[in-house]
């Protein structure tokens, strides 16, 4: 059976790992949650033990839902007397997007009506509504015309552990606190005898969560006590009781063995008082030392190693002070230089203000606030002394370094004139060093440079040892020229095996970097996938379309992460429509639009097979961008082959052009041949490929071809 565990954005991969460790058969991270395969017992175990999940949703039904009548009918088909006992209460949470039903509260009310009417038609007592503590809490997910009705097995938000009696302003949610601790490696550090320190502990969330984690306490034990999370009739009470009994045994053993290695301080005596009250209720007061203390007054800790966790102030209510962040960084380097730090900062600029070198950086959300989590291990990185001579580059690496410097000089004026911050600096210029190197400059914060290195397949006649050596030399040269540490180099290397050369596994860092192109901020992921979310070679064509879209309607087919749509929106397009079969890419597109303040009804996202959608659509557009894949096969659509389907595709796209409109068609199939005779029957067509290649791709002019079509 499949179920869904939701979480805050940025925690998806951590949650997937946690659910697998808890016994799930399969856990796949998606946007703001994890799709899980497992039995009902696995879902109930997650309710009891997950430190990261927000909710655990067990599906009851799924159906097409084009309008409110379909929603009512789909819910009414269920035998609700088998799910809700007589006299029990009901509540519904609803989440809607990309659908004709735009108000979540209205959707929730229609579901309540359907449940109540169904039960009353059976002659049973009408259930009452209790929004605070219902016997059965239902959840509606309505996305793009598809509705899923689920039981919220936890009965509400799982971050509520049951111990928070007092809080200071802007408290940290407990499941986000757990993520900060897990990214810091706190469970392993505790097992190795390390300590835990929070020098700005507020009401104690991080330290209390850390103590309960160290004591092996199930988060759901105190939340539910002797009660059960849900009175849904399908809830397995016997299984739940077995899980609770096991958890209580572990709780007893863990609390008895809990070591007193946890310290917290804060300059606010009211916050410390709240922290002590919360720790008392959580049953860990004796394991945590709390005291009133300024950050700069911290003393050296007795443990040689340990973990610092901290959530410094950063939102509108608690005005962030860069000087405070700097004092925090300086103090930690002085008192716990060899410890590991996991700091949840408001943004990259504040993280940079600490002066600490982040080995890893993650993007998390504290409610609606986007935060930067930096992990420093160790806190104080040894400084290179003037006497230490840098490692000399090999002869081959020096050749690559010289070419990189030459290319940088070559592109300097062009980049300055066009405002280019992301570009290709090397494209197998030296044949024996066969790779592409792309530069991505962070648009915010400390404007860091990231390198994206993609290795090309080497001929089978070249020994593997030589291939590896040359790649190492190329990386060494790139790091020296751009002065970037290894953790800011995303390498997509190839591995030889059966079937030839292929790319190996990528890192799973979930690290998002914001970059800028043509005035638009864009989210790229350099490490987790083969592609980054931004095809640099299409830069000139995107710029042309953005300029032509001002005050006009823009359509982006096979939109990928929606970069062209975002740039058209920023340039002043009256409306944009972005079509892609992938929900993941559409969410990425939505995030890009929101990053630029362009979220709203005039920017439509359509999850559909682009060709089928075109042939059914009746709206017209002024500027259309069509950049299809070479091949595509999906369980949700017919197989697609650009050579076979391009005439049909272009005919359908041209039919959607408004008078005076223009279609830009591009693809990167090397052997593609446009059927000029067939296309001439319905459009005027001009190849514009040379005009769509910027200087950084002049060595690779066949990376794509492009045409301009008008009706």
UniProtKB/Swiss-Prot annotation:
Stretch forming the signal peptide: none
Assigned EC number: 2.1.1.173, 2.1.1.264
InterPro entries assigned: 23SrRNA_methyltr_KL, DNA_methylase_N6_adenine_CS, RlmKL-like_Mtase, RlmKL-like_Mtase_CS, RlmL_1st, SAM-dep_methyl-trfase, SAM-dependent_MTases_sf, THUMP_dom
Catalytic reaction equation(s): guanosine(2445) in 23S rRNA + S-adenosyl-L-methionine = N(2)-methylguanosine(2445) in 23S rRNA + S-adenosyl-L-homocysteine + H(+); guanosine(2069) in 23S rRNA + S-adenosyl-L-methionine = N(2)-methylguanosine(2069) in 23S rRNA + S-adenosyl-L-homocysteine + H(+)
Protein name: Ribosomal RNA large subunit methyltransferase K/L
Family: Belongs to the methyltransferase superfamily. RlmKL family.
SUPFAM superfamilies with a match to the protein in the record: S-adenosyl-L-methionine-dependent methyltransferases (SSF53335)
Record bears the keyword Transport: no
Gene3D superfamilies: 3.30.2130.30, RNA methyltransferase domain (HRMD) like (3.30.750.80), Vaccinia Virus protein VP39 (3.40.50.150)
Organism the protein comes from: Xanthomonas campestris pv. campestris (strain B100)
Gene name of this polypeptide: rlmL
HAMAP family named among the record's database cross-references: 23SrRNA_methyltr_KL
Molecular function terms, GO-annotated: 23S rRNA (guanine(2445)-N(2))-methyltransferase activity; RNA binding; rRNA (guanine-N7-)-methyltransferase activity
GO cellular component term, pick one: cytoplasm
Subcellular location per the Swiss-Prot or TrEMBL entry: Cytoplasm
Role, per record: Specifically methylates the guanine in position 2445 (m2G2445) and the guanine in position 2069 (m7G2069) of 23S rRNA.
THUMP domain sequence ranges: 42-153
Superkingdom classification of source: Bacteria
Keyword Metal-binding: no
PROSITE patterns per record: THUMP, UPF0020
This protein's UniProt keywords: Cytoplasm, Methyltransferase, RNA-binding, rRNA processing, S-adenosyl-L-methionine, Transferase
CDD domains: AdoMet_MTases, THUMP_AdoMetMT
């Amino acid at each position: 059976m499949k179920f869904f565990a939701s979480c805050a954005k940025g925690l998806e991969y951590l949650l997937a790992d946690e659910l697998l460790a808890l016994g799930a058969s399969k856990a796949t991270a998606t946007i703001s949650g994890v799709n899980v395969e497992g039995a009902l017992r696995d879902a109930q175990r997650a309710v009891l033990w997950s430190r990261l999940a927000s909710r655990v949703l067990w599906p009851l039904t799924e159906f097409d839902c084009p309008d409110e009548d379909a929603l009512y009918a789909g819910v009414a088909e269920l035998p609700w007397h088998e799910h809700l006992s007589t006299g029990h209460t009901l509540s519904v949470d609803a989440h809607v997007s990309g659908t004709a039903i735009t108000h979540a509260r209205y959707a929730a009310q229609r579901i309540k009506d359907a449940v109540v009417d169904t039960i009353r038609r059976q002659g049973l007592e009408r259930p009452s509504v209790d929004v605070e503590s219902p016997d059965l809490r239902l959840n509606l997910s309505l996305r793009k015309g598809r509705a899923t009705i689920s039981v919220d097995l936890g009965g509400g938000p799982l971050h509520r552990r049951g111990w928070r009696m007092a809080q200071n302003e802007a408290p940290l949610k407990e499941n986000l606190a757990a993520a900060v601790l897990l990214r810091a490696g706190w469970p392993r550090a505790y097992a190795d005898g390390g300590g835990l320190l929070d020098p700005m502990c507020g009401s104690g969330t991080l330290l209390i969560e850390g103590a309960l984690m160290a004591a092996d306490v199930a988060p759901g034990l105190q939340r539910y006590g002797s009660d059960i999370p849900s009175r849904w009739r399908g809830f397995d009470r016997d299984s739940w009781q077995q899980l609770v009994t096991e958890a209580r045994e572990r709780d007893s053993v863990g609390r008895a063995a809990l070591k007193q290695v946890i310290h917290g301080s804060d300059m606010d005596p009211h916050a410390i008082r709240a922290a002590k009250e919360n720790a008392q209720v959580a049953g860990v007061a004796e394991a945590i030392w709390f005291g009133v203390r300024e950050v700069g007054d911290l003393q050296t800790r007795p443990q040689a190693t340990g973990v610092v966790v901290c959530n410094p102030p950063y939102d509108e209510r608690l005005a962030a002070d860069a000087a405070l962040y700097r004092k925090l960084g300086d103090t930690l380097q002085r008192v716990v230089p060899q410890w590991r730090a996991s700091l949840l900062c408001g943004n990259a600029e504040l993280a940079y203000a600490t002066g600490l070198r982040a080995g890893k950086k993650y993007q998390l959300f504290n409610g609606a606030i986007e935060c930067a989590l930096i992990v420093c291990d160790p806190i104080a990185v040894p400084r290179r002394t003037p006497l230490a001579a840098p490692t000399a580059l090999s002869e081959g690496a020096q050749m690559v370094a010289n070419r990189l410097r030459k290319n940088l000089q070559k592109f300097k004026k062009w980049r300055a004139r066009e405002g280019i911050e992301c570009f290709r600096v090397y494209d197998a210029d030296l044949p024996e060093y066969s790779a592409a190197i792309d530069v991505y400059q962070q648009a915010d914060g400390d404007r860091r440079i990231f390198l994206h290195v993609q290795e090309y397949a080497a001929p089978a006649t070249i020994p593997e040892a030589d291939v590896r050596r040359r790649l190492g030399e190329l990386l060494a040269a790139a790091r020296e020229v751009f002065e970037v540490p290894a953790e800011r180099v995303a390498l997509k290397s190839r591995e030889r095996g059966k079937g030839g050369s292929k790319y190996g596994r990528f890192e799973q860092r979930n690290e998002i970097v914001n970059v800028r192109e043509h005035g638009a901020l864009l989210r790229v992921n350099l490490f987790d996938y083969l592609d980054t979310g931004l095809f640099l070679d299409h830069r000139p064509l995107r710029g042309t379309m953005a300029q032509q879209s001002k005050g006009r309607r823009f359509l982006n087919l096979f939109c990928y992460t929606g970069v062209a749509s975002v740039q058209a929106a920023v340039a002043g397009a009256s409306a944009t429509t972005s079509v892609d079969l992938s929900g993941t890419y559409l969410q990425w597109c939505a995030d890009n639009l929101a990053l630029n303040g362009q979220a709203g009804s005039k920017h439509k996202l359509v999850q559909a097979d682009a060709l089928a959608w075109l042939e059914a659509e009746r709206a017209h557009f002024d500027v259309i961008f069509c950049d299809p894949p070479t091949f595509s096969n999906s369980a949700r659509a017919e197989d697609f082959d650009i050579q076979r389907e391009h005439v049909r595709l272009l005919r359908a796209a041209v039919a959607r052009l408004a008078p005076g409109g223009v279609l830009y068609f591009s693809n990167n199939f090397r052997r593609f041949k446009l059927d000029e005779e067939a296309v001439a029957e319905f459009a005027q067509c001009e190849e514009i490929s040379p005009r769509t290649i910027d200087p950084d791709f002049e060595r690779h002019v066949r990376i794509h071809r492009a045409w301009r079509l008008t009706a």
